[in-house]
């Protein structure tokens, strides 16, 4: 995304008819890039199974939560910040 940041900013500028390139780079591109870096650094921890307390009625069982991929996700994004509002939910 960083390699294509200038092209993204130009496309958003063309769509809006004069949006500031710096605003697009800071408010959209860099925000998504930083969110992706944050998620990438924590992905192993988030994806590993973890133990959770079992209800008293079911003891002595052990309970755990095992995260699974979501699969295909549809995102409906508003128009005001198209890159950020479309990609941040995918990163989260």
Label for each model-derived stretch:
Residues 1-64:
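N-terminal Rossmann-like NAD(P)+-binding subdomain of aldehyde/semialdehyde dehydrogenases
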Residues 53-92:
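Conserved small-residue-rich beta-alpha loop and adjacent elements
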């Amino acid at each position: 995304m960083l390699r294509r940041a200038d092209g993204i900013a130009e496309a958003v500028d063309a769509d809006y008819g004069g949006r500031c390139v710096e605003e697009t780079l800071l408010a959209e591109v860099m925000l998504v890039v930083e969110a992706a870096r944050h998620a990438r650094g924590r992905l192993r921890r988030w994806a590993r199974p973890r133990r959770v307390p079992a209800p008293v009625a079911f003891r002595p069982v052990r309970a755990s939560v095992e995260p699974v991929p979501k699969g295909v996700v549809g995102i409906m994004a508003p128009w005001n910040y198209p890159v950020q509002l479309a990609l941040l939910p995918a990163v989260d």
